[in-house]
Amino acid sequence: MAYTANENIAIAESDSPIGPFKQETAKPIIAEGKQIDPFVFVDKDEKKYLFHVRLTDGNRIFIAELKDDYLGIKEETLKECLHAEHGWENSAAVTWTVSEGPTIQRFGELYYMFYSANDFRNPDYAVGVAVAKQVYGPWTKLEGNPFLSRRNSGFSGTGHGDLFRSGEQWYYVCHTHYSNSLVAPRRTAIIPVDFVANSRNLLVPKFNGEKFRLLEAEDR
């Protein structure tokens, strides 16, 4: 499990997906700087990559190949993937722009990156998608971004999630603001995602806003 603590990334291990997770040596896998939002991606050739966010001239998404033991990155492979540069990604026109929360999936010959932009406290926090032919890019942001925002979810602060499949259906689980007037405590939501071909015969995500719903914990 890759996680963030005190703006550093670490890896913990477990024999079961439900834990407990432990670290033999409690230290970050990247020695310098500040990093958040790790996502471990294993490609079809079994190479392991760490997509993550570096706090440098804004929140920017990077990739690096992981060492075989997961306890560090191969520094020479570090490369920036993308940063906020379009209007929807910086609706508040701030100098410290934000692109974060990367999730990577491969469909056919293309890599898809779901990412979020704007500060998470901004009602316009939203999800965009970029594609690449190679895991190191270049990454091209799709026309139609953002694909998930308060405009089709009905909730402010919709973003920073993960993609998973149940049966034949894909879903995206993400944060939202507590309400359209309060940011915290943030809530968790789920929304079905379909992939449809656009005019260029490229698969693009289609979020079903009518089925967007908040997840609630059961009392036990």
Q: Which ranges hold each PLM region?
A:
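Carbohydrate-active catalytic/glycan-binding domains of CAZyme proteins
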Residues: 1-220
